[in-house]
Amino acid sequence: MTSSPGPRQLLAAERVRTLDRIAGLERELSGIIEAAQAANADDEHDPEGATIAFEREHAAALASQARAHLAVIDAALERLSAGRYGTCTRCGGPIAAARLAARPAAETCIGCAAQAR
């Protein structure tokens, strides 16, 4: 019988996936920037300029979101090391095991998450 991975393993795996995603997005962004520099520099009058600008902004936004997700994962790992993992950062109550299984980096219980929306 194989035991399921613990929170540290889940968070570590998610961290690796997120770092890989950031690296891929940064490579994509670099490629877009290089392509834009090689193409016509006049975005306003170049029919491809708007597309290149959109792709650049889209890749930059995705990379920013991935970096923010990495910070959330790192915060969860810090809470785990400090013995505060599974405790809501808002109300101090427990975070349900089902929520942690679905979102290992969850900072808040379901009640506080619902209130925040």
Regions found by a protein language model. Give the residues of each.
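Short, intrinsically disordered, low-complexity terminal/loop segments
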Residues: 1, 116-117
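Interaction interfaces in information-processing and related assembly proteins
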Residues: 1-82, 102
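Short, cysteine/histidine-rich loop/knuckle motifs that typically chelate Zn2+
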Residues: 89-91, 111
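Short functional micro-motifs and their immediate structural scaffolds
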Residues: 95-96, 117
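Short, non-ligating residues that shape and space the ligands of small metal-coordination modules
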Residues: 97-101
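Cysteine-rich micro-motifs
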Residues: 105-114
